[in-house]
C-alpha cells in the first residue's frame, strides 16, 4: 500500500499531468494552482534502489538547482512517533544530511483527508549552506517530544502545495533557488572598496 502513495507523490513532483490531476482532484482552486506550478519546473523523481536503504529515503528528488531525499510515511492517525526501525531511518537521514550537506525531508500523507493530504517536514541538520540554507528556513522541521525526540505531526507540517510554490515559482516574490541566491548575497556584509583617489588622499595624510 505504501508504494501506492510513493507513486502518488512521485507523479506530482515529476509533473506527470495524469497522475497529478488525480491527486489534486479534491483540492481547492488555490491548491490546484500551486500544485500545477510543478508542470513548468518538474523534478526527476527516482525511487531509491532498495527503498529503505539507510539514509537514502524512499525517493530522490532532483532538478538542476536542487536535490533532496524524501522519506514517505502514510498513516491514519495524525501523529507518528518514531521508534525502532522508523527511528533508525530518521537517524540515518540525519547522518547522511550532515555528511553530504543535504536537506532530507519527510512527506506525510494522512489517510481519509480531502484536499491536500500531504505535509512536508525538514530533518534538522547543521551543514546546509547557500540556497539550501535559506530554503530550509521556510520549511518546518520535525516537532519534538518533551524528551527531545523527533516525531511527525501532520498538523504542524507544510502543505505540499505550499512547498511546491516555494520551490517552483519563478518570480522574485517567492524564494526559488535563483532568488534565494540573491537574498544570500544581499544578507552578506557589503565591503566597500575605496576609490583610487580616496586611497591616495589617505596615504598622503598618513
Report residues per predicted region.
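A short acidic (Asp/Glu
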Residues: 57, 81, 116-120
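Domain-level recognition of nuclease-like catalytic cores that cleave nucleotide substrates
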Residues: 103-105, 109-173, 178-180, 187, ...
